[in-house]
Amino acid sequence: MTYAELCVTTNFTFLTGASHPEEMITRAAELGLHAIAITDRNSLAGVVRAYAALKELRREADEAIRIRSQHRIDSCSRQEVGHPQPIARPEAPRLPRLITGCRLVLRDSPLHWIALPRDRAAYQRLTRLLTLGKRRAEKGDCHLDLADLLAGCTGMILIALPQGRLDGALPHLQQVQRRFPGHVFLGAAPRYDGSDQAWLAACARLALRSSAPMVAVGDALMHRANRRQLADVLTCMREHITIDRIGTRALPNAERRLKGHADMARLFRDHPAALRRTLDIAARCSFCLSELSYEYPDEVAEGETPQARLERLTAEGIVRRYPGGAPQRVHELVAKELKLVAELGFPAYFLTVHDIVQFARSQGILCQGRGSAANSILCYLLGITDVSPDQIAMVFERFISKYRGEPPDIDVDFEHERREEVIQWIYQRYGRHRAGLCATVIHFRSRAAIREVGKVMGLSQDVTASLSGQIWGQSNGGADPERMRELGLDPEDRRLALTIRLIGEIIGFPRHLSQHVGGFVITRGRLDELAPIENAAMEDRTLIEWDKDDIDTLGILKVDVLGLGMLTCIRKAFDLMREHEQRHLSIDTVPQEDAATYDMLCAADAVGVFQVESRAQMNFLPRMRPRTFYDLVIEVAIVRPGPIQGGMVQPYIRRRQGLEKAEPFGPELAAVTARTLGVPLFQEQALQIAVVGAGYTAEEADHLRRSLASFRRMGTIGAHRDTFIAGMRRNGYSQEVAERCFGQIEGFADYGFPESHAAAFAMLAYVSAWLKCHHPAIFACALLNAQPMGFYAPAQIVRDARDHQVELRPICVNASDWDNRLERRADGALALRLGFRQIKGFREEDAAWIVAARGNGYPDPQALWLRAGVTPAVLERLAEADAFADMGIGRRDALWQVRAIRGQAPLPLFNDPLDGEIIHEPQVTLPAMHLGEEVVEDYVSMRLTLRAHPMELLRPAIPGLTPHDKLASVAAHRVSVCGLVITRQRPGTASGVIFLTLEDETGVSNVVVWPKIYEQFRRIVMGGRLLRVTGTLQREGIVVHLIAQRIEDLSPRLADLGHPMDSAVGQTTPQTDSAPRPRPQPRAMHPREQAKRLFPSRDFH
C-alpha cells in the first residue's frame, strides 16, 4: 500500500515553505508516493515548476535513468553527487501523480481549505476564485471570504485544515459540507508535539459530528529534515523578528518534512481509513495541467480567416519591401513559412504582433523586433523586424519548429519612455479579462540573502554590510570564509558559521513575484480561467502568477513588449534633427555603409553607441576594424560567452587579419561558415552544420542544439556525439573533421548568439554610431534625455561630447528646460544646454512651472519664487546646482537668498503681506567658493561637472603619474596612473579577471586585474573610487591595457577638494508657530564614504 500527500507547501508560499517545488517532486518520487498535491497559500505560482520537474523525471525514466543517477544534479542547490562506479541500469521508477491545488486562507473562517479541482471546469473556477480575491487586494495579498468559497468551489475536493484549537470549526465545516456534499473532508495533520494521538482522536470526533470524513495529511513544509533551521529563519523574516525571539513560532522538530507511507502509517496507526482516503481523493482528482488548451485570439474582420489575413498582409509587404519585385528565394521562403504557420495554428499570433507594431508606429513610437523572430521572412514583410534575407541567412527552424512543440517567441523593443502607451493599448484592445503580463520571480541573491539572514541571526549591521560588500554585483556565490577572515571575522564562530550555511541554502529561493519586463499573455477566452490574475505594484497593470518559463512549459504564447533605451535615444535624436537641421530621418533612411562612421568605430570611439560601448567591445573594435554592416553583426555577437568559451574569437581575428588561413571542411560546410571565415559564431550556423554535414533534419538539428547542455550535465552526451559523427562519416567526412565540427557545436551550444538577434541589434548600433559621428551634439543631447540607460553615466557622456568639440552650457533658470536642449551658437554650430532633469531629486512638474512663468526671464530667486510658485525646497536645489549663476549670483549667495525666502513663510496671524510689502534681508557678503568646492557641489547636486576634473586639481599632490592620454606613446614599460573608477566589470567568461576603467582629466585607461592581484587588493578594487594603479603596459595596435601589479586606494584624497556645504550659509529660520528646533546635523562621513556617495561607479558582472 502507498500514500498520497495532499497538502504540500513549497517556497512559493513566500517566506514559509522551505523547499523548491522541484525538490518536493523529486523527493516524492524517491519516497514512492502515489500522488502529491502542491497547495501553496492562495496561489498556483509554484505548480507549473512541479509539473515541469515531473515531466523531466518521466523523460529520464523513459531513458532508464534513475532518479539517483550516476550524475544527478539538483538545480536548486547546485550540488552534484557522483558515484565512483556506474550504476546498473534499473527499471524505470514509479513516479507520483501531480495534483494541482492550493490552500485557501479566508478572512472569516478559522479553517484553512485545501482546494483540489477534479477536472478542468473546476480548475477554471479555482483560478477565477483566486483572481477575485487577488484583484480585491493589494499586490501579493488575496481577500477571500467563506461566501466566495461557497459560490466558487463547485467540482473541487475541499479539505478543511483546523488551525490550533477545534473550537468554532464545526459550524463552518457543516456549512461547507451541506453546500458540497461528498466533496468535503477534514484534514488531520500530526502536531509533532507529543500529543499526536489525542489530537487525531479529537479530529476524528469532529469529522464524525460534521459528516466530513477525516483524511490524513502531512502538511509538509520541506522535502528533507535538514531544512528545518531554514524554515525557522523564513518564519523570522516573515514575522520581522530575530531568531532569539522566535519562541513558540519555531518548528519543534523536523517532522514537517515530506514523508513516505511507512512514516504516515505509523502516525495514523489508529486511523487507517484516513490514510486510505488519500488514495481515493487522488483518484477523484483527474485534472492535469496538460489539459489546458491555449487558444490565441483571432481578432479579424468578418469573412476573413486569420490565415487569409496573414497571407494578404504578407503579399502587401512583398510589394512594400520589394517595389521592383521580390527574388524567387523570397517567394520560396514565404511559401514555406506560411505553410508551417498554418499547420501549427499560429497565424493569429503573427497578426496580433503586427497590430501592436502598427499601433506603435501610428503613434510615432519607434519599435523593432529582434531575437529569433528576425529569422522569419514573414516578420520582415509584416514590418515586425527590419532584418532582410539579404543581410543574414534566415533559418526559420530557429524561430518555429514543428519538432519542438513550443510556441514561437517574438520580442519587440519599443522606446522605453513610451512603452506604457503600448501596454495600456493592449489592455484596452483585449480587456484585462483576456490580457495580462507574465510574472517574474524575484529570488534571493547573495546580497539580499546576507542582509536578511544576517538580520535574523542577530549579526550587527556592520558585519552584514562588510559581508555583502565583498560580494561582486548580483553574485550567487555566498560568503567565502577567507573573505571573512580578511574582514576580521571568525568563520569558526558557531553562530556566524550557521549564518553562512543558511545564506547558502536560501540563495535562489523565491522572495516574491514581480511583473515581467513586457511579456504579455493574450487569450481568446477568459485569461483568468487559464491562470490567476493579480494586481501589479504599478498602477493600471495586472499580471498572471506564472513566469515565462512556466508558460513555455505549458505551450502558451506570449508577446514580448520590451523597452529599449536606445530606441528612445534615436527617436529623440531624429526629433532634434527635424527641429534644428530640418532633416527628416528614420532608421530605414539613415545613410548606409558610411565610411566616416566606420572610421570612428575602428578608432574605438564608441561611448554611447549601442552594443559596442563596453570596454571589451571598444577594445575589440580596432582589431575587428568593421567596414560593413555584416562586420557589425559579427562585432555584436563575438564578444559573448559562446564564442569566447568555444575558443572561436582568436581564430576569427587571426583569419580576418590575414595571419592564418581558413581551414575548410569541404565545399558544403565552407558555404555555411564562409561569411565568418570558417569559424561558426552563430546558433544558426550550428544548426546548418548538423544539417549539411551530418544529414540531420532541421528539427533534429535544433533538438541537438537545445539538448547538448542538459545531456552534457547528465553524462550521456556520448550518444549524441556518436550519432553526429556517424552522420558526417556517411557523408564522406573524415573522423577528425567530424570530431572538430561536433566540438565546435558543443563548445558554444549553451551561449551561442543568434545571427538574427545580432543583426537586429547591429542596425541600432550602426544608426547610433552614425548619429554620434555626424551629429555629436544631437546624439549627446538625445542620449542624456533618454537616461537612465546604457553603460556610462551622464558625467562620461558629457565629457565625451566635449571631446567631440560640443560646447556644454550649464543649467540656468533663464535658459534651461526640463530636457537638455540645443542652442544655436554664433558660428552656426549647436551647443548643448543642460536641463533641469540633471539636478538630483528635481521634479519635471516643477521644471514645467519655471518654464511656463519665465517670460523674459527672472531677475532674482525671489521673482522666480513669486511667479512660478515653486517651493523654497525647489529653489534650494536650483541654488545648489548653481542655476542662478547667469544672474551673477554664486552658489553661496543664492543659497543665502533662498533661505531668506524660506524664512518669509506666512505668519499664522497675517497670511498675506501688506500691499507690495516684502521683508528684505540685509546684504551679506559671503566668501567665494574655490574651484575644488565648486566641483564637489556639482557632483553633489548633478553627479557631473562642467568645471575641472577632480584629477586635474589633485594631480599636483600625487606625483609620479602618467596621464591617461600619454599611455599609447610613453616609452616606459612600467607606469602609474590614477583616476576615478567609472566602471568595473567581471565577466563570467574572464576566469576571475577584473576590468577597471579609470578616468582622469585627459581620458580613460583600461586596467586589467588578474585573479592573484585581485585577491591581494580585493577590498580596494571593489570599494575604491579614486585608485592609483602601478603596472606594466600591454599594447596591441591602438589598444593599450595596464596590467595591474599594485593598487592603492586614494579615495580619501577626494576630500581635499572640499566638503559639501551643509552648514555654509547658516541655519533655516523656524516658522513662528513652530517650536524652535536645532538644525539636524549630518552624520560625520568618512572621506572614503563621501567619495562613494559623490563619485559612484557603474559595476557590471
UniProtKB/Swiss-Prot annotation:
Keywords: Cytoplasm, DNA damage, DNA repair, DNA replication, DNA-directed DNA polymerase, Nucleotidyltransferase, Transferase
GO biological process: DNA repair; DNA replication
SMART domains, sorted: POLIIIAc
Catalytic activity: DNA(n) + a 2'-deoxyribonucleoside 5'-triphosphate = DNA(n+1) + diphosphate
GO molecular function: 3'-5' exonuclease activity; DNA-directed DNA polymerase activity; nucleic acid binding
Region named Disordered: 1055-1101
NCBIfam families xref list: polc (TIGR00594), PRK05672.1 (NF004225)
Protein name as catalogued: Error-prone DNA polymerase
Gene: dnaE2
